[in-house]
């Protein structure tokens, strides 16, 4: 930890050994930032992405220079299908720390897949169009667009939510349930997903089994996603499939 006033390394004292500034508040803020980061890391490990996002944003509120927290937030956004938001966090991270920063690697790998990035960006634009169709009452058109969007960017959880919401409004509850079960595999404790599932269960009188009804193919797909990790400072966290490194 370095003094924010002069940049000198700090010891255990509440005062900077170089400039004499009281650094007690700085140390407290950085401690809280690291605490929220570690909690966010735990959430990310169990694919509670929305919970991880909330904690990582809190971490950055206390210390915007917390590079591991910002990089992990980018990974969480990527896992949620928000590649543009992920890239933004990594660019900010790189601007704060240009050397020895994993963000540089993430940016490079993402930019190498320009076609995929363009496809993701297009899917987000199409989502906004689908949302506009919903507001104008053109639900059938929105459904067609959202199905295509999910094919292009299967991690875009807000597209799953909007499609499920349309199905609920149209009283097509089993279709909504199917979409929401896919959403829960992206973000296991997402409050919107769980709220919509609860509504489906109330309307149908049937509970949703989120495990035993999975097909073998679905289970293998989920397990493959869970096994995708990377390591930094002896801690294991999720890694987007696009960023997997080949083993020797």
Question: Model-derived features: where do they sit?
Answer:
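Register position in tetratricopeptide repeats
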Residues: 45-46, 79, 96, 113-116, ...
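Conserved structural position within tetratricopeptide repeats
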Residues: 24, 60-61, 92-95, 148-151, ...
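Helix-start (N-cap) detector for alpha-helical repeat units in TPR-like alpha-solenoids
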Residues: 29-34, 67-68, 101-102, 123, ...
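Alpha-helical adaptor scaffolds
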Residues: 34-45, 112-151, 157-158
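Short Cys/His-rich micro-motifs in 6-15 aa windows
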Residues: 20-29
């Amino acid at each position: 930890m370095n003094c924010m006033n002069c940049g000198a390394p700090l010891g255990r004292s509440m005062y900077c050994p170089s400039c004499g500034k009281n650094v007690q508040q700085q140390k407290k803020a950085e401690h809280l930032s690291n605490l929220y980061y570690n909690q966010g890391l735990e959430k990310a490990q169990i694919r509670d992405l929305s919970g991880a996002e909330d904690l990582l944003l809190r971490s950055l509120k206390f210390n915007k220079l917390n590079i591991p927290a910002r990089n992990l937030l980018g990974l969480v956004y990527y896992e949620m299908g928000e590649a543009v938001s992920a890239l933004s966090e990594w660019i900010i991270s790189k601007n704060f720390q240009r050397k020895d920063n994993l963000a540089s690697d993430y940016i490079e790998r993402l930019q190498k897949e320009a076609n995929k990035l363009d496809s993701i960006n297009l899917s987000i634009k199409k989502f906004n169009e689908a949302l506009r169709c919903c507001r104008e009452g053109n639900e059938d058109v929105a459904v067609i667009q959202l199905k295509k969007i999910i094919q292009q960017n299967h991690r875009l959880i807000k597209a799953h939510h909007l499609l499920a919401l349309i199905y609920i409004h149209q009283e097509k509850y089993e279709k909504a349930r199917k979409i929401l079960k896919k959403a829960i595999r992206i973000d296991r404790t997402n409050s919107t997903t769980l709220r919509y599932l609860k509504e489906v269960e109330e309307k149908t009188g049937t509970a949703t089994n989120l495990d035993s009804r999975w097909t073998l193919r679905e289970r293998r797909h989920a397990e493959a996603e869970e096994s995708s990790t990377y390591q930094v400072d002896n801690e294991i966290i999720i890694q987007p499939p696009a960023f997997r490194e080949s083993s020797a």
